[in-house]
Amino acid sequence: MAVAVEITRSEVLRPSETLAAGGGGKRSQLTVFDRAAMDWYIPAVFAWDGAAAPSNDEVKGGLAAVLARYPHLAGRFDVDERGRRCFNLNNAGVRVLEATVAADLADALAHDVAAHVNELYPKADMENADEPVFQVQLTRYACGGLVIGTACNHQVSDGQSMSFFYVAWAAAVRSAGATLPTPFVDRAAIAVPRGPPAPAFDHRNIEFKGEHSWTHSYGSLPLERIRNLAVHFPDEFVAGLKSHVGARCSTFQCLLAHAWKKITAARDLSPEEYTQVRVAVNCRGRASPAVPMDYFGNMVLWAFPRMRVRDLLSSSYAAVVGVIRNAVARVDEQYIQSFVDFGEVAAGDELTPTAAPPGTVFCPDLEVDSWLGFRFHDLDFGRGPPCAFLPPDVPVEGLLIFVPSCAAKGGVEMFMALDDVHVEAFRQICYSMD
């Protein structure tokens, strides 16, 4: 049964004037980290049952209050006098849609999520020069349940920034605007080049699509061949994985090692072929000096653990975790400073991020992102945390996202996309530690 989503209201919500701490039409340059992020809107969709759902007015009131501390979200993209893209911190506001569904949320979550999740967040008009960079949709169900779907341009912020923002938004609703954060928003201060700048790595082809970029080698598939899957790993399974590793490791490291092994086996690749994972690395604590964890913007680079297929499949979990850990460790303060220096050298150049377009096939490789640090239970608007995180379609084969489970018993959800021909083989082995 298809669920009809009816848009009932559309407005532009501006920050609370009495609380605004920044903006006022100032311009802010994109950092080289922003330029490396995809110029695309990233959706996030959360659901609250009727007992925990706040009213629309409460949600909008808290949003107006918290936007006063996040001027980039309330601003617009602009072009400076040198023709470079920049932020205009003009407090122009965010788009807010309100919608209704003539069905109960529990029924929709049980039967129709995949069929209508992409109707639960706003669709940005990429051709509109004045398009809000952050957009919200509040969808109310017949039972009183609420789904909040957002879409934010990735060049504005990374996942860590948005997780801090969502928690701050919830706190603003709970406190009726009395509890507001003071995030670090000075982009110029987090990417200071040396004098003279001295990039030491080939960033034009690693983080951007230069002439010799690794992204040029990937093929594509019709979107109907790319299957989206959700795999739940209970806490007990994660604990068993860590025990299987036999050495100290993080939840992310052991789950990535497991997923890399099982997906590679399901793909039935040649033993002599190489496979690598593009791992998003938060650089805030790795930079020198360190950048505050509440910095709002992009501060992500990528690590590339790589193994021959036969070695990956025959190696112990501890060995694979070691390969992942060593690759991530190479994204150190020297590498980060080199990237910042490259940004200065290439400030006037046209740079294209290595983001994969829909239909891209990463096989034999993977790309992984982690929201495991996102405290979903802190996303409490006053009556309780969300009952579900709803994954939108992932249109890129080989992309994995780890998210903490909203289930009462905890655990981790892995949202992923695979070529349909490999799905059944993966399902048969995804919980095996052999």
From Swiss-Prot:
Family matches, as Gene3D superfamilies: Chloramphenicol acetyltransferase-like domain
Keyword Acyltransferase tagged: yes
Origin superkingdom: Eukaryota
EC number(s) per entry: 2.3.1.-
Any one GO MF annotation of this record: acyltransferase activity, transferring groups other than amino-acyl groups
SUPFAM superfamilies (UniProt xref): CoA-dependent acyltransferases
Keywords (A to Z) from UniProt: Acyltransferase, Transferase
Residues the record marks as active site: H154, D380
Family annotation (InterPro entries): CAT-like_dom_sf (IPR023213), Plant_Fungal_Acyltransferase (IPR050317)
Role of this protein: Hydroxycinnamoyl transferase that catalyzes the transfer of an acyl from p-coumaryol-CoA to tryptamine, to produce coumaroyl tryptamine. Serotonin and tyramine serve as acyl acceptors in vitro. Can use caffeoyl-CoA, and to a lesser extent feruloyl-CoA, as acyl donors.
PANTHER family referenced in this protein's UniProt entry, alphabetically: TRICHOTHECENE 3-O-ACETYLTRANSFERASE, TRYPTAMINE HYDROXYCINNAMOYLTRANSFERASE 1
Family in the record: Belongs to the plant acyltransferase family.
Name of protein: Tryptamine hydroxycinnamoyltransferase 2
Organism per entry: Oryza sativa subsp. japonica (Rice)
Gene that produces this protein: THT2
